[in-house]
Amino acid sequence: MDINQLETPSLFVDIDKMKTNIKAMQQRINDLGLTLRPHTKAHKIPAIAQMQLDAGAQGICVAKLGEAEVMAQGGIKDILITTPIAGQKKIQRLITLHQDHPDARFIQVIDDYYHVVEIAKAASAANLCVELMIEVESGQQRCGVQVGDDLVQLIHAIQSTDGVSYVGLQAYSGHLQHVKGYCSRNEQARSVVVPLFDFITSTLEPQGMTPQIISGGGTGTYAAYQGLGYSEIQAGSYLFMDAAYLAIGDETNATENQQFSPALKVLSTVISQPTPSRTVIDAGMKCLSIDLGMPIVEGIEGVRYQTGGDEHGILHHEEGCEIFELGQQVILLPSHCDTTLNNFDTLYAVQDGKVICQWTIEGRGRSD
């Protein structure tokens, strides 16, 4: 059917642009001599994860255990869970995940001795060995052990405990992904992790603690890590390329990132025009995430979106500008793809104005 036959608000992706973005990032990562482990919290759909794997990705990332369960049920067999877990229920779910999918590989990120002890206890009871990756603080001041003795002791604890194994380190600087300016962003991304790689060379390697995997990076910072020591990149948003990432600049343009094309859109409808300079559409905060800024109205110059609450979006434009009428459809480019996907049940794939397929967003709401 034609895209204009969709009920609004609806979430859709330009399938050709998305596929081009997938291929482009894979080639860029290959050219850097790294491997790509895309973060699927961006899309939350096993079928799209499989497209990324088919293009050359070596595995995937998920943010939460719930997303891992969705991806494993969808047939994905190499999954890194990038957020630490705590509590017996979560740990037992991790064990059950291994038991339910014995042919799959799961790596759990941790940053505390508690994780080692509790996961090892549950894994040993189930006759399993769980692979662990240690998160290292890399500037974001979120999770992560400090580089130094604490890191050495945590690695030693894993290496000396049955039921778990040490596979590597995660150093993800999420706070730098949207730094504007290609050179500035890359300089900051490298400088914040240089102490880690110096420590690996000076301390971890001589003690037999060399990480097999060093994972991190994102759509904004992946290019900074060539030759630094990372083995895999966790970029995710590149396949949709939301408005926030478009604004960070690239190697040729200081204000616009043209490495990838904006593919994710929201289709909305004009429902009211109270004044000549104010138009209201049916896309509010329940469908458009605004944590990274306001969405962009596609194809119409001089129009500014303002949230009007849960179900309303307000478009501001010059008075007397006859550009909208009631019932007209408007396309918006979301500012943050990850959280916008979490507002919808369905993602429609569109090609040349036609809906060619649709996916259930299976990982929606799976922050558990």
Language-model features: locations:
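Active-site loop ensemble at the mouth of alpha/beta enzyme cores that anchors a bound cofactor
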Residues: 188, 220-300
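Generic N-terminal amphipathic, Lys/Arg-enriched alpha-helix
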Residues: 1-13
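N-terminal glycine-rich anion-binding loops that anchor highly charged ligand groups
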Residues: 17-48, 61-63
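Active-site-proximal beta-alpha core segment in soluble small-molecule metabolic enzymes
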Residues: 39-178
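C-terminal accessory subdomain/extension
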Residues: 273-368
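Active-site loop/helix belt of alpha/beta enzymes
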Residues: 131, 137-250, 254
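Flexible, glycine/charged-enriched surface loops at secondary-structure junctions
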Residues: 34-35, 205-213, 341-344
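Conserved, mostly hydrophobic/aromatic
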Residues: 18, 41, 71, 134, ...
